[in-house]
């Protein structure tokens, strides 16, 4: 059975292999957020936020540049500025997918004009005691084993009891 640390190490090597952070740094201020940043990983996904004055243009450039690098198998583009969705920031998003170390990985990159309180939340999660961190990872594990997805029960919903 995999461990949270193994998922984290796979994520770290995926970020290095794809060089996605280097590419995104050319488009704005990059922050890795969510479970990777807090080292609370279970599922094979990474959340990144790019702060930029031009979210739409930056997202379009990113998807074109990433496609040319040929490091990912599949991309999705989302427009939550002109097509708002509940619980989603006014933003543009790229989902980049790749098989890596036997898992189907997804890197979600959000292009926004401001970050909000995401970094404060990550800091709170990093500072949790080990028991709470283990409980969060166990809840993520149970979500995965039950067949639920992060869209059925998001990690942010899991975190609410701890922050």
Where in the sequence are the language-model features?
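Helical scaffold of the NTase/Pol beta-like nucleotidyltransferase catalytic core
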Residues: 1-33
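Exposed alpha-helical structural elements
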Residues: 6, 10, 19-23, 58, ...
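Active-site nucleotide-donor binding segment shared across nucleotidyl transfer reactions
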Residues: 20-63
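Short, charged/polar surface micro-motifs in flexible loops or helix N-caps
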Residues: 53-58, 101-103, 114-116
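A broadly used, surface-exposed interaction patch
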Residues: 54-81
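Conserved catalytic core of two-metal-ion nucleotidyltransferases
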Residues: 71-109
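Catalytic cores of NTP-dependent nucleotidyl/adenyl transfer enzymes across multiple folds
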Residues: 106-163
């Amino acid at each position: 059975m995999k461990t949270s640390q193994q998922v984290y190490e796979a994520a770290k090597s995926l970020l290095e292999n794809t060089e996605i952070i280097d590419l995104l740094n050319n488009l704005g201020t990059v922050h890795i957020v969510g479970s990777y940043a807090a080292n609370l990983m279970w599922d094979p996904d990474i959340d990144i936020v790019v702060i930029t004055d031009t979210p739409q243009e930056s997202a379009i450039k990113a998807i074109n540049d990433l496609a040319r690098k040929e490091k990912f198998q599949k991309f999705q583009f989302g427009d939550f500025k002109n097509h708002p969705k509940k619980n989603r920031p006014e933003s543009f998003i790229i989902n980049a997918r790749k098989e890596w170390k036997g898992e189907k990985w997804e890197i979600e990159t959000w292009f926004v004009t401001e970050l909000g309180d995401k970094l404060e939340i990550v800091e709170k999660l990093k500072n949790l005691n080990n028991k709470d961190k283990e409980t969060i990872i166990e809840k993520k594990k149970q979500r995965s084993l039950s067949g639920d997805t992060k869209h059925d029960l998001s990690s942010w919903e899991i975190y609410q009891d701890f922050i």
